[in-house]
Amino acid sequence: MKIIIMLIIAYLIGAIPSGVIIGKFFFHTDIRQAGSGNIGTTNTYRVLGPTAGTIVMVMDILKGTIAALQPTLLFHMNNRYTLLIGLAAILGHTFSIYIGFKGGKAVATSAGILLAYNWEFFLIASAIMLLLVYTTSMVSVASMTAFPIVTLIAIFYYQDWLLSLVAFALTLFIFYRHRSNIARIKNGTESLVHFGLGWRRQQRANRK
């Protein structure tokens, strides 16, 4: 029964639409009606600016972390339960009950779960992600590249079967949630964040 209750709470925490809340309350903008329509960090960054984007990213990470920490903080259960409970937060973020069972792509919330389970692994994953975002200026490409790399690290360096399994599942889920991005990447129409080497290359090309 405890696990069922924690799964429900984790889903409800994960379902909190950070981007919608920040957009409506502080910018009088419904992020779902602007840019790509996604409620996550990247679209918030593009539409509302870096401050709003950073706040939404932190909120989405914390959603995953707080939800996943329930077993260890409240019931002193094995740390491995954090990954199980955390998956419910990802479902909440992706299919939010508060906004008609729609949501974001769960990259930041997934990172939050990793933080709850293994902070060192979270830092490694974050460093890889930031490096890829800086190199490509495309969060979608960075996400779809970082997760497979992180999965390999879990398998071969940490040799943690549960972490490896969850990382692999998250990789598949991230690719599934980025279907529209993959189509835009193939067509050369994927938007860049105004940051990093990819953005600079595009700016130089536009000036020629």
UniProtKB/Swiss-Prot annotation:
Its main location: membrane. Pathway: Lipid metabolism; phospholipid metabolism. It comes from the Bacteria. One of its GO terms (biological process) is phospholipid biosynthetic process. It is found in: Cell membrane. It is an enzyme of class 2 (transferase). Coiled coil: none annotated. It catalyses: an acyl phosphate + sn-glycerol 3-phosphate = a 1-acyl-sn-glycero-3-phosphate + phosphate. Its EC number is 2.3.1.275. The chain crosses the membrane at residues 3-23, 55-75, 81-101, 113-133, 155-175. GO terms for molecular function: acyl-phosphate glycerol-3-phosphate acyltransferase activity. One of its GO terms (cellular component) is plasma membrane. Probably interacts with PlsX. Catalyzes the transfer of an acyl group from acyl-phosphate (acyl-PO(4)) to glycerol-3-phosphate (G3P) to form lysophosphatidic acid (LPA). This enzyme utilizes acyl-phosphate as fatty acyl donor, but not acyl-CoA or acyl-ACP. NCBIfam families: glycerol-3-phosphate 1-O-acyltransferase PlsY. Belongs to the PlsY family. This is Glycerol-3-phosphate acyltransferase. It comes from Lactiplantibacillus plantarum (strain ATCC BAA-793 / NCIMB 8826 / WCFS1). The gene is plsY.
